[in-house]
């Protein structure tokens, strides 16, 4: 099953376990957010929204907040010794799609537990 969602003015086709980068969404790392603007649900019997599918949402886990690549805008007016250089970086949220929900259901899965790094085993002294 797949869904077409709209967030940040862009549309994305998603399936469960997809990882995607979208414009900044409020939420702490590791929390589950719900994306409510579902334009289409696909599968055996596709549902097309007018403009959105009623009662459908997509649950996603926030993996990271970061900044995108620098975009430079350079304007030059020839023969006038006039130029302007500006740059910016978008704020990006990395999401993992956990579930596609229909009929107003709530997400059944909570946030995944944090990974704990395994402590290295104490090295046995070879000299003894």
Swiss-Prot record:
InterPro entries: bL21-like (IPR028909), bL21-like_sf (IPR036164), Ribosomal_bL21 (IPR001787). The keyword Ribonucleoprotein applies. Pfam families: Ribosomal_L21p. Keywords: Ribonucleoprotein, Ribosomal protein, RNA-binding, rRNA-binding. Disulfide bonds: none annotated. Residues 119-128 have a biased composition (Low complexity). Residues 104-128 are annotated as: Disordered. The keyword Ribonucleoprotein applies. GO terms for cellular component: cytoplasm; ribonucleoprotein complex; ribosome. GO terms for molecular function: rRNA binding; structural constituent of ribosome. GO terms for biological process: translation. Part of the 50S ribosomal subunit. Contacts protein L20. This protein binds to 23S rRNA in the presence of protein L20. Belongs to the bacterial ribosomal protein bL21 family. HAMAP family: Ribosomal_bL21 (MF_01363). This is Large ribosomal subunit protein bL21. It comes from Rhodopseudomonas palustris (strain HaA2).
């Amino acid at each position: 099953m797949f869904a077409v969602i709209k967030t940040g003015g862009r549309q994305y086709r998603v399936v469960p376990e997809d990882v995607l980068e979208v414009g900044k969404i409020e939420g702490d790392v590791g929390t589950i957010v719900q994306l409510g603007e579902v334009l289409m649900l696909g599968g055996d019997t596709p549902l097309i929204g007018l403009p959105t599918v009623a009662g459908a949402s997509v649950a996603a886990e926030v993996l990271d907040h970061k900044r995108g690549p620098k975009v430079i805008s350079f304007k030059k007016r020839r023969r006038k010794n006039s130029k302007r250089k500006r740059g910016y970086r978008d704020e990006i949220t990395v999401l993992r799609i956990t579930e596609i929900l229909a009929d107003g259901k709530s997400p059944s899965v909570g946030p995944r537990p944090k990974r704990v790094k395994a402590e290295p085993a104490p090295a046995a002294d070879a000299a003894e």
